[in-house]
């Protein structure tokens, strides 16, 4: 079979895997303490769901937001995202381990992390007023052989978890942490990229005086961005341009 046909078949199989279960952030660990997240496949159907630090969402299918939703509020903290009632405290410079329920191996792509100051209690914030600055991102790790090794592969190998460090220089206060996977397994075609944004409320303590400029959630991406419209089954020797704003550095 010709290589082009093999690559096409690989892409087709990856698209078919959409029926496979995606995951979500079920909880986080901060300084040894576990905080439960919003269990969308359970709490969305309950009249007595507990308060959590995780934002609620209507994405009970564990689905995604694609390029057609990049200018809608759904891209901010997933479909119909609404603030969690609780907030977890973390020291500036501290680490947050985000635990996913699962992640499909075929759904290769980057992992990105943003913060947005709430300007008050995050439980009452209007998500459309949030302005996000990127604090960390990982994309293509090894592109020797398509579809390559990606940040999602490392997440899977780390027991479906990802750890992000809060910058030491930012002002203390209440923030929304926007943690996101972008699945690129179908991104060779327009609106094929799949965004899975997950949001939690945190309070940063002991920080510095930095107030990084941010970007509204609906302005983070365009469906034609080089890191959004990207074929992972082609030659990857040129690397991968991580989409969105540049990572904040103090």
Curated annotation (Swiss-Prot):
The entry's keywords: Copper, Disulfide bond, Glycoprotein, Lignin degradation, Metal-binding, Monooxygenase, Oxidoreductase, Secreted, Signal
Signal peptide (UniProt feature, chain positions): 1-21
Temperature curve summary: Optimum temperature is 100 degrees Celsius.
EC identifiers of the protein: 1.14.99.-
Residue sites binding O2 per the record: 185, 194
Cofactor: Cu(2+)
Residues that carry a glycan: 159
GO biological process, any: lignin catabolic process
Enzyme type, top EC level: oxidoreductase
Cross-referenced InterPro entries: AA9 (IPR049892), AA9_LPMO (IPR005103)
Gene Ontology terms: cellular component: extracellular region
Residue positions binding Cu(2+): 22, 107, 196
Activity sensitivity to pH: Optimum pH is 7.0.
Superkingdom of the organism of origin: Eukaryota
Disulfide bond annotation, renumbered to this chain: 77-199, 118-122
CDD domains from the UniProt entry: LPMO_AA9 (cd21175)
Biological role: Lytic polysaccharide monooxygenase (LPMO) that exhibits oxidative cleavage beta-O-4 linkage of lignin resulting in the formation of aromatic compound guaiacol. Catalysis by LPMOs requires the reduction of the active-site copper from Cu(II) to Cu(I) by a reducing agent and H(2)O(2) or O(2) as a cosubstrate. Does not use cellulose, cello-oligosaccharides, xyloglucan, xylan, chitin nor starch as substrates. Able to depolymerize the lignin dimer guaicyl glycerol beta-guaicyl ether (GGE).
Name of the featured protein: AA9 family lytic polysaccharide monooxygenase AA17
Organism of origin: Aspergillus oryzae (strain ATCC 42149 / RIB 40)
Lineage of the organism: Eukaryota, Fungi, Dikarya, Ascomycota, Pezizomycotina
């Amino acid at each position: 079979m010709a290589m082009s046909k093999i690559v096409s078949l690989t892409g087709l199989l990856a698209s078919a895997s959409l029926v496979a279960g995606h995951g979500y952030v079920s909880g986080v660990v901060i300084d040894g303490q576990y905080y439960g997240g919003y269990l969308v496949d359970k709490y969305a159907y309950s009249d007595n769901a507990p308060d959590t630090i995780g934002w609620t969402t209507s994405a009970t299918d564990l689905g995604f937001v694609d390029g057609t939703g990049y200018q809608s509020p759904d891209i901010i903290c997933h479909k119909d995202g609404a603030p969690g009632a609780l907030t977890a405290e973390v020291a500036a410079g501290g680490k947050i381990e985000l635990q996913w329920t699962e992640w499909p191996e075929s759904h290769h792509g980057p992992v990105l992390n943003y913060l947005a100051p709430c300007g008050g209690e995050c439980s009452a914030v209007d998500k459309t007023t949030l302005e996000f600055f990127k604090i960390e991102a990982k994309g293509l790790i090894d592109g020797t052989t398509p579809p390559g090794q990606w940040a999602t592969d490392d997440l899977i190998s780390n027991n479906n978890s990802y750890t992000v460090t809060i910058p030491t220089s930012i002002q203390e206060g209440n923030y929304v942490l926007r943690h996101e996977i972008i699945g690129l397994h179908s991104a060779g075609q327009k609106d094929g990229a799949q965004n899975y944004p997950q949001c939690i409320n945190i309070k940063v303590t002991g920080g510095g005086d930095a107030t990084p400029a941010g970007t509204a959630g609906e302005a983070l991406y365009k469906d034609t961005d080089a890191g959004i419209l990207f074929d992972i089954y082609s030659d990857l020797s040129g690397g991968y341009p991580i989409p969105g704003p540049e990572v904040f550095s103090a």
